[in-house]
């Protein structure tokens, strides 16, 4: 009979993703942003973190983690299709609000030895998501 010991296994993809989001969230809070929603999902889209900047701007954050810089690293892994899914989810989220605040799309790119916060990483118009 084969046995499996979780203590020697690597964390699941979902667990690694949650750890990356925790790390990104902690960094953004240190920069003065406050969490609004985590893992917002709708049909066809998802947002890892929705934060509020000190000036009231709503910040939609995509968190990307890579084990190395191959293929351009974490930031390069955000394809136009992924941007469209984030924008779609952001539009869905904004439709639930009584008043739409200023918004932006940021990326937190995590690699083993660094964290990079890319503010205004992309915009809704350039992402090409339909209304």
Curated annotation (Swiss-Prot):
Residue ranges of the region described as Disordered: 1-21
Pfam family, one: UPF0102
Gene3D superfamilies membership: 3.40.1350.10
Coiled-coil residues: none
GO molecular function: nucleic acid binding
Biased composition (Polar residues): 1-12
InterPro entries documented for this protein: Restrct_endonuc-II-like, tRNA_endonuc-like_dom_sf, UPF0102_YraN-like
Domain of life (superkingdom): Bacteria
Similarity comment: family membership: Belongs to the UPF0102 family.
PANTHER family: UPF0102 PROTEIN YRAN
Designated name of the protein: UPF0102 protein RALTA_A3032
Organism: Cupriavidus taiwanensis (strain DSM 17343 / BCRC 17206 / CCUG 44338 / CIP 107171 / LMG 19424 / R1) (Ralstonia taiwanensis (strain LMG 19424))
């Amino acid at each position: 009979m084969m046995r499996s010991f979780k203590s020697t296994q690597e964390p699941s993809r979902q667990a690694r993703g949650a750890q990356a989001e925790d790390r990104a969230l902690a960094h953004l809070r240190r920069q003065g942003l406050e969490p609004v929603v985590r893992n917002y999902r709708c049909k066809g889209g998802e947002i890892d973190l929705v934060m509020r900047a000190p000036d009231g701007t709503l910040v939609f954050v995509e968190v990307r983690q890579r084990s190395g810089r191959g293929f351009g690293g974490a930031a390069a892994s955000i394809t136009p299709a992924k941007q469209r899914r984030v924008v779609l989810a952001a539009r869905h989220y904004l439709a639930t609000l009584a008043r739409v605040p200023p918004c932006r799309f940021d990326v937190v790119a995590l690699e083993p030895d660094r964290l990079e916060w890319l503010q205004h990483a992309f915009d809704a118009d350039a992402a090409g998501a339909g209304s």
